[in-house]
C-alpha cells in the first residue's frame, strides 16, 4: 500500500478544493512541476494529477504543466480530468504519463473503457467519485442516480489497473476517510483499489492499513501534505510492507 500525493491543476496553478466545490478553492505557491519534484524528493513513489479545468469543461488547458511534470520527475504519474477519447489518452502517454484516469467518459461510454482496457491493459484507471453512494460527473458538478457499487461491479470485468474511489463529502475536509464506503467497494471487486478523500492525519493512514488484505493498494493525499499535517517519509513508514506492526483486525467489524 502506498501514499500518492495529489496535484490538482487549475489555470496553471496547484489548488485544492473543499468537497469538490470550485468556489471553495485554495491556491498554493509552488509551480506544479516544482511541487511534483518536491514530492519526489520527499519520497513519493507516484504522483496523482487532476486537470480540474479539463474535468469541468472537457478541454485540456494544463498540458504545459503536465508535460513539464512528466519530464522533471522520475516516478510514475497518473492523470485524470477531461479524458474522454483515445486520441487524448495517446497524447498523454506520449508525454510520459504512466496511467490515465477515466471518470465521466467511463460512465457515459462503457464500450470505450472496454476497448481501451484491451488496447492499454492495466494502464487505465477508473475514477469513481461519489456523494452519498451515487456517482458525480464533470468535475463533480453533475450528480447522477448511478450507484458507485454498480459501476465497480461492471468495470471489474475489464483489464483495468485499479479503481480510485473518492468520497466527495470528505474530500478536502481533513476529517478522516469514509471507511464504510471504502470497505463496501473492496468487498465487491478483485481489482486493486485506491482510496481518496478526507485524510487529515497520520492516524487516518494507519487506520486504512486494515483494508490492505482486501485489496486497498494506495491512498491519495492532497491537503494534509500541503498543510504539513505529516511528512511523506512518515506515511511511507506507516504504509510500508516492512512496518513493525499491522493494525489489529476487529473481527466484528469485518463480520
From Swiss-Prot:
Entry's localization field: Cytoplasm
Catalytic center residues: 8 (proton acceptor), 129 (proton donor)
Signal peptide: none
Catalytic reactions of this protein: 1-(5-phospho-beta-D-ribosyl)-5-[(5-phospho-beta-D-ribosylamino)methylideneamino]imidazole-4-carboxamide = 5-[(5-phospho-1-deoxy-D-ribulos-1-ylimino)methylamino]-1-(5-phospho-beta-D-ribosyl)imidazole-4-carboxamide
GO BP terms in the entry: L-histidine biosynthetic process; L-tryptophan biosynthetic process
The protein's annotated pathway: Amino-acid biosynthesis; L-histidine biosynthesis; L-histidine from 5-phospho-alpha-D-ribose 1-diphosphate: step 4/9
Stated name of the protein: 1-(5-phosphoribosyl)-5-[(5-phosphoribosylamino)methylideneamino] imidazole-4-carboxamide isomerase
Organism: Prochlorococcus marinus (strain MIT 9515)
